[in-house]
């Protein structure tokens, strides 16, 4: 098993052999078509951002806490850490929390980014943190929203609270950042852990403004997990919605059929055109770091290998293998490691 893969020009052929041999053969649409299709799926009426922030200044960091609007009635809470060096513009990184978390969970990495001269930005995902009046109760409201989206019968009002809607919010957050006079619009990065990493590969794939990407315990293949009975970890993140779907479909247990039914409704085409092996192709030739763990049940390694192999093929075709790297921590389950935390910071520093 391949535990550590660091791909640079001198070692690309050796590292690819094991990966490419496992790749599932799917004839995805072109990258341009996939990007256009994903944007069309998530498009919604354009509204003014109407940003509003409170600013707190300390000796080491300027903290901005506020919000923008991504939709008419959808306020996106944002936390920004800005360096105090007085530079005219800064590179900026959006970093995203995992399931049941909140933007404040990322204070440590935001502060470390500031120490490296980078503006750090974090948001609350849909139905997390301040998106819920009084604060969300872990993932309770998120799972309830996914369940409601499953039970919705009005196609014109179908929502996608499971990952997709937050990806749209990230496009609007990027719109806001490039509108700021203190942000260098050609020096933007995005990353996240677990759910936040998935939201990153969804949003960044179709948004070329994001130049540097880090994906932590989030790269996978939804199709591989479904086809190989390794869906349990991923399904567990919104298990209540899946259990309701199984009941609605007359099943006494979770199975491939009712799981796919939920994904087809809440995450259309996540097992084909918008699966990770397809969307990672869109990252090339931008700087991409993938980190994960060997025994992650949420992102099984064989599916992650397929996604990475697909990405590598795209980077090879664009002569950009020096801008993609991967590290897999052996023996660990679904967890982010201190080593990967440092790699994340180093990657953003190197390429921004």
What do these predicted regions represent?
Residues 40-88:
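N-terminal cap/lid segment of alpha/beta-hydrolase-fold proteins
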Residues 88, 99-168, 224-229:
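Cap/lid segment of the alpha/beta-hydrolase catalytic domain
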Residues 197-208:
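Short glycine-enriched nucleophile-adjacent loop
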Residues 1-26:
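Bacterial Sec-dependent N-terminal signal peptides
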Residues 182-194:
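Alpha/beta-hydrolase fold nucleophile elbow
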Residues 284-301:
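Conserved strand-to-loop "acid loop" that flanks and positions the catalytic carboxylate
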Residues 212-279, 300, 304-308, 316-321:
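Mobile cap/lid helix-loop segments that gate and shape the active-site cleft of serine hydrolases
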Residues 245, 308-352:
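C-terminal catalytic histidine-bearing segment of alpha/beta-hydrolase fold enzymes
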